[in-house]
Amino acid sequence: MIDIKELSKVYLVGDERVKALDQATLHIYPHEFVSIIGPSGSGKSTLMNIIGCLDVADAGTYHLDGLPIEAYTENQLAQIRNRKIGFVFQSFNLIPKLSAEENVELPLIYQKVPRNERQVRVRAALERVGLAHRAKHLPTELSGGQQQRVAIARALVTNPSLILADEPTGNLDSKTSKEIMDIFHELHAQGNTIVLITHDNDVAKQASRAIHILDGQITEVAL
């Protein structure tokens, strides 16, 4: 599924070279639920961006479903992202003027899926997160937890190989956070591969496996 070997990434900040990743190596198997945990500045966001094909490493190799990611152009990476990866963000990233179902539909429009099929798949995705009854509502008419459910439905609608969630409970209260984590557990039980980025130990421990990152290095892989 995900095979990363000795990844390194350096950024220039003014005149200073900052090593965001330092020969990081990890393997994530199909259908796993894995958390990547680390403090601010640990390199977890850089690792997430590379796993999500939003950035490329300076050195090392990354294979996603057997594809050598570093060999692809930016346009090809965009196609891989849209086909293989569903993203869930801390800030939901919903378009305010679009209804819940229209937000969920967007990735399918990009894929040029026929309208009738789009409608069926959008409905099914919203049902999976328990929000079909709010399909016509705008984001401003939904609670934070409901907006995150819409974001999860949007991630699911393309049937991706990988769900990549970046601090998905970061803006939510404890009760709503539990509800969102329950959805991730249900999705994992249904066979989805989930990688969850977090700084919260309590959230990280809910995954089947926790990968700890510090100063750009994988320091521990805990069951």
Listing of model-derived features with the role each one plays in the protein:
Residues G43, A222-L223:
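Generic detector of intrinsically disordered, low-complexity segments in short proteins
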